[in-house]
Amino acid sequence: MYRTRGFIYPAVLFVSALVLLIVNFVAAQYISRCMFEKETKELYIGENLLQNGVLLSIRHVLEERKGQEGTQQFLYGRVSYYIHDTSIKEQKEINLRVSTDSGTERTAQIVFDQKQKKLLRWTE
């Protein structure tokens, strides 16, 4: 009964536009959430690898192993560390390089005191 006046066509267009707007909003929210989860996972993996690298390098220093560098492959990435002497005899400077399997790289510098057995500085 309203077809002759053209009421149904504008209503269909309005409802279609509304549905597309809602679908667009939901898709944008989903993509944003997925990207956040991926970036958060990369952050936590990088932090974990850095902490493992610090523990490995400190163990290397305390056990007085030969050589001034080391590398360890983990399930989610790789850790490399280089140990340098500082002007203070008891302190060692350690450079860490971490790369995850997805390609993210992070670096950190720490200063470790052998006498007190504690970290003096951590810089990323």
UniProtKB/Swiss-Prot annotation:
Keyword annotations for this protein, in alphabetical order, are: Cell membrane, Competence, Disulfide bond, Membrane, Peptidoglycan-anchor, Secreted, Signal, Transport
Localization (cell)? Cell membrane; Secreted
Q: How is it modified after translation?
A: Partial processing of ComGG in competent cells requires ComC.
* UniProt membrane topology term: Peripheral membrane protein; Peptidoglycan-anchor
**Gene Ontology cellular component annotations, sorted alphabetically:** extracellular region; plasma membrane
Signal peptide residues are 1-28
Assembly description: The transformation pili are flexible filaments, consisting mainly of the major pilin ComGC and smaller amounts of the minor pilins, including at least ComGD, ComGF and ComGG. Interacts with ComGC; the interaction is probably direct. Interacts with ComGD. Interacts with ComGF. May act as a link between ComGC, ComGD and ComGF. Homodimer; disulfide-linked. A minor fraction of ComGG is found as a disulfide-bonded homodimer.
Functional description taken from the UniProt entry: Required for formation of the type IV-like pilus (T4P) that plays a role in transformation. Transformation pili are dynamically extended and retracted, perhaps thereby promoting DNA uptake and transformation. Required for transformation and DNA binding.
Stated name of the protein:
Competence protein ComGG
Organism of provenance: Bacillus subtilis (strain 168)
Q: What is the lineage of its organism?
A: Bacteria, Bacillati, Bacillota, Bacilli, Bacillales
Gene name tied to this protein:
comGG
